[in-house]
Amino acid sequence: DMRGCPVMVISGNTTMVHFLLELDAWTVFSAPYAPVTSNPGFYSGKELEMDFGGQIYFIPAISNYVGGDIVSGLLTVDFYKKEEIGLFFDIGTNGELVIGNKDWLIAGAGAAGPALEGDISKYGIRACDGAIDTVKIYGQDLFFTTIGNKKPKGICGSGIIDLIAEMRLNGWVDISGTLNPEASGRVRYLEEEGQYVAVYAEAEESWDGTPLYFTQTDISQYLDTKAAAHTMLDCLLESAGCTAQDISHYYLSGAFCAHGNLESAITVGIFPDMSPERFTAIRNSSLDGARTLLLNRNRMEDIEYLTEHVYSVQFASMPDFTIRMQASKFIPHTNMEDYPTVQKKIDERKNTRERHTI
């Protein structure tokens, strides 16, 4: 019974908190970009017209776009207390990043797009029963698994990343993401779409007898989202005077990060070409952080420290952001020297295909 609870902790982005408090949310993303509050503090259940007898604490935001959900998420990691540099990346439709150590912290945020959560393509769906969640390609053959082991209804974010990564490794698409119809019979021109598509589930494989496919346009839209995520990371590293190699550990938050294949995410160029041991995935860091604070009030000191010491940057105001994004609209990147492991895999798969055709 919530009415008997003494305290509730809420962590959310600045816009959602404004909605909950019935404040003007337009102030968050309209000039002069000054939210009504970034630190609501405590409210009673009665003030919010909730059937709750205790106090409700809202975790404060760092800026308009780096909200209390990110501050809460940082409670689940500890790089802001260490000498080594760490990086926290909450990635979904929006991307929020924090980089630093015990001496300095820099945050940034921007729109990534819906592709990483499956919300592109005619057959892109959220993670649910019947969603294709993993894809493997061997030569011309494609294999997949679905959530719940059901016949496929569509493909979710983790499946899309696998699909694009595997197509790149096996020559179904080139570095620009252009489909290659000579690579497999599953890559074909579809009259009703007016373009080439990659069929990942034939009609006899799907739940309703409809072939499921990813179009050339879908790939382009995906690369826009992927490029935004990569460019935000790239710009934040430059703002901090760091390279990807300088980061001792990457903390990845969000459903996509918890369920997606890290190697595929590196292959398509979302994340830098690093050893998997340098990455930790956290499913719901905002919820975990709120729980941590609820069970240990001493962590309020961390909340105060983070909101006072994190410097926020604006990616959109960086003069070369658009140029960097264009360079990132490749698989994995226009500069393959930054992705030696991916290049090695591409070469190995190509050699395997050539041996099988001799």
Where are the predicted features?
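Nucleotide/phosphate-binding catalytic cleft detector across ATP-hydrolyzing
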Residues: D1-M8, N13-L87, F214-Q221, P319-I358
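Short glycine/threonine-rich loop-to-helix capping motif typified by GTGT followed
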Residues: T14-T27, C242, G254-M274, F315-R324, ...
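Catalytic phosphate/nucleotide-handling subdomain of diverse soluble enzymes
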Residues: N101-D103, E238, C242-T307
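Glycine-rich phosphate-binding loop of actin/hexokinase-like ATP-binding domains
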Residues: T27-G45, S72-L75, Y80-G159, N261-R283
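Glycine-rich phosphate-binding/hydrolytic loop that grips phosphoryl groups
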Residues: L48, P60-V77, L223-A227, F279-A316
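Short glycine-rich phosphate-binding loop at a beta-alpha junction
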Residues: M2-N13, I164, Q245-G254
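Gly/charged contiguous loops adjacent to phosphate- or pyrophosphate-bearing nucleotide/cofactor binding elements
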Residues: I161-T225
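Phosphate/ATP-binding catalytic cores across multiple sugar-kinase/actin-like superfamilies
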Residues: D1, I70-G73, L223-Q245
